[in-house]
Amino acid sequence: MKIDYYEALGVTRTADDKTLKAAFRKLAMQYHPDRNPDDPEAERKFKEIGEAYETLKDPQKRAAYDRFGHAAFENGGMGGGFGNGFGGAGGFADIFEDIFGEMMGGGRRRSNGGRERGADLRYNMEVTLEEAYAGKTAQIRVPTSITCDECSGSGAKPGSQPTTCTMCSGSGRVRAAQGFFSVERTCPGCNGRGQIIKDPCEKCHGQGRVTQERSLSVNIPAGIEDGTRIRLAGEGEAGLRGGPAGDLYIFLSVKPHEFFQRDGADLYCKVPISMTTAALGGQFEVSTLDGTQTRVKVPEGTQNGKQFRLKGKGMPVLRQSVTGDLYIQIDIETPQNLSKRQRELLEEFEKLSWQENSPKSAGLFSRMKEFFEGIGE
């Protein structure tokens, strides 16, 4: 039984060219033999959708099919010029190259002489918070592949030249029959390079590149954060046989700081002060990342955990003229190892100031006392 071409592609009879192509592309990828090896049903479906699309994409064939159905192509219909077979070097393979380009192997692609882009490289670098604040220029040494200076990247021994592969005629691909259609594969004679090096360079063994450690200068901008990535174009691994170099990616991490914690552009720190300074008031100095000393006033009666904000004393925002703030949290130290006299004074202070100077704690203990006395009754 003949298939309905529209049903095979899952489209209506009014589908335009764009819809036909999209439907064919989706189904071709689904049933492609490379994705369904040894699956006769997938191969059958693959053949059907190819036959359907080959007919419907051509306006004249489609018009004939819409009018006469499959009879339009039987017994030499339409002058015998519109057969729906897929033999020869064109036909089915050409349809796929039109739709997918190089996905099917790029039969129309020509060899680039085996040149391949070099691999991208990664380099991990750790910087201090001070360096992240101010920025810096760092010198790094990266082990990588560079172009061989003996053969200038060709891979061939000086005085000789690579020869064109006779198996693929320099295309790097060969066409192989697979059932009712032909597909393209990487040429086994040259591994897809299109050229064969008979006399390889002794220094690079035909690769066109050698391994060597390089020294590079890296500019680290102010305001970088943990995980910031810097790309150095063309500083990666050298390309194969004269191909373009890859890129080098610097991945930055910021060391934990002894005093400051970071949250975006803002910095946080804790400053210990004495109990008397918190009660009577005073001041202290804090060193900031810009190298200055900033004096902070502590008002009398400052409570533990009180936070002070120093505007513009945080981290710069990467590539912006904006700076975060520094938040200082007060950490009141409780005195230890008191002398007899100190203890006496504190006990006297407690008796004099319990109600007047500590209303929160006095009120809490008063309510607790009343609560438990009520339970006892």
Swiss-Prot record:
Superkingdom as given in the UniProt entry: Bacteria
Domain J: 4-69
Localization of this protein: Cytoplasm
Sites where the protein binds Zn(2+) 2: 165, 168, 187, 190
Binding site for Zn(2+) 1: 148, 151, 201, 204
Residue windows of the CXXCXGXG motif repeats: 148-155, 165-172, 187-194, 201-208
Protein's UniProt keywords contain Zinc-finger: yes
Assembly information from the UniProt record: Homodimer.
Comment on protein domains: The J domain is necessary and sufficient to stimulate DnaK ATPase activity. Zinc center 1 plays an important role in the autonomous, DnaK-independent chaperone activity of DnaJ. Zinc center 2 is essential for interaction with DnaK and for DnaJ activity.
Cited PANTHER family: CHAPERONE PROTEIN DNAJ, DNAJ HOMOLOG 1, MITOCHONDRIAL-RELATED
Protein name as it appears in the record: Chaperone protein DnaJ
Source species of the chain: Brucella ovis (strain ATCC 25840 / 63/290 / NCTC 10512)
Originating gene: dnaJ
